[in-house]
Amino acid sequence: MHFPAVLLLFLALFPTVLTQTVEHAELLIETTARISDTDANYICATLDWWPHEKCNYNQCPWGSSSVLNLDLSHPFLAKAIQAFEHLRLRLGGSLQDQVLYDVGNLKTPCHPFRKQKDGLFGFSNGCLPMDRWDKLNSFFKRTGGLVTFGLNALHGRQKIKKQWRGNWQSSNAHDFINYTISKGYEIDSWEFGNELCGTGVGASVDAELYAKDMIRLKSLIDQLYKDVHPKPLLLAPGGFYDKVWFEKFLDVSGPTTVNALTHHIYNLGPGSDHNLISKILNPKYLDKISYTFRNLTQTIQANGPWASAWIGESGGAYNSGGRNVSNTFVNSFWYVDQLGMAAKYKTKVYCRQTLIGGNYGLLDTNTFIPNPDYYSALLWHRLMGRGVLDVNSNGSPYLRSYAHCTKERAGVTLLLINLSNQTEFSVGVKSTTSISLHASAKAQHKKRSFLHGLKQTVSWVGSKASDAPLSREEYHLTPEDGNLQSRSALLNGRPLQLSKTGDIPSFSPVLEDVSSPVSIAPLSIKFIVFPNFIAPGCREV
């Protein structure tokens, strides 16, 4: 590597050596109305089917993280899930359309996946034994997981070139779902197929055929769950957005079939790309995916307003993620920006690839210790409520901002992301409510003292003005030692580390005077909670 390239990489990874500048910015939060609402369990993580033989770019990062062999007894795993109270877990992935279920009249032996040169994705069919399914459900019940299970949508079809034709054979899925119901296992949602829409990835199915088989699956679920409440949701197609395919699918399946359209996001490209970090820190690059969100929203509004949008799988970089990138602090800039952007575009659920496995796991594949993105996800889950508010900024594109109603209490939570490696931003925060309140107060109380007028000016952070100082809560995420590729994150300067028994550390905020500007350092992330922010749009969320 030439010296200039080495220097640029060094400066990107260790930004503290640069001379910092301070830039002022103003944010206006629209608090009178919400622009969208997420599901109460917006944060979701996936468990995949890949065996340890899954390799990319001369590395094999999956270990024993599969649905079939993950160590469910590991205390770190249980505590990581329980910290979310009810973490949504999506079981699926590339190999799900090769999974058979060892129940009923299955006529083939129940063998695990094995390498097969002419197999889909280089693997043979695999099988889920019911004793493993029993153990998984015991684990989900113990940890409070909300389960989305991806069904095999290729069973019974025939491959003709890349496209798969013929009707879906539903008998194995029928027996599996029936077994699941008989055991009292609660499934939040069933998903049909993985990355079979449009041109597909390893395989594809025509939209009309797919929709007709979805109608059959819906009928099957209605029949099997006729005496069970609540009835699980039905999701599809679990693939990359294709306008024509999605429109046809919605038109043929009709308004009573699918509850949510699931789509996948891997907008950073292959995990082998040496430019992953520069993509993550480039606001123009991050903005590109907004067109997909916008177009899907329009497709649903025009063709299937009964359905909601879910991101069923998103890992940033595909093919197992980027080594020493996807599992480090720098990836959190991409991840939290995705969470904010997706919510703005009416996404109800966001499933991160993966909870564990590959380079992009929220947990380390071998040690089960949380990577930085885990803590970003948990902070989001605990602070950002369902209601999404619009934010207008006059600042640099390197300052990203998102606002939600604060979770389970009054107020508003603001997320700031500083992508600049040199600029500290000093941010003034106002709201549409504060402006109207101030104007009204000025008109009605012209003769009041300056001090009382000042209290009225800042009354947007509380329902009543008082002599007591008003504070906001700040949760500031930075990388350990200023190294963007650190596997450790700091919260307000303190390392986020598990206890010896795997307990998740507490999140203690720094309290700041609410009337002072919000400061955010270069290459850092900050959640700011305004506890008593007057936000009419947050009522009844």
Regions from the language model: what does each represent?
Residues 2-260, 290-312, 316-541:
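Non-catalytic accessory regions flanking glycosidase/transglycosidase catalytic cores in CAZymes
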Residues 200-205, 264-292:
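Substrate-binding/catalytic cleft of secreted carbohydrate-active enzymes
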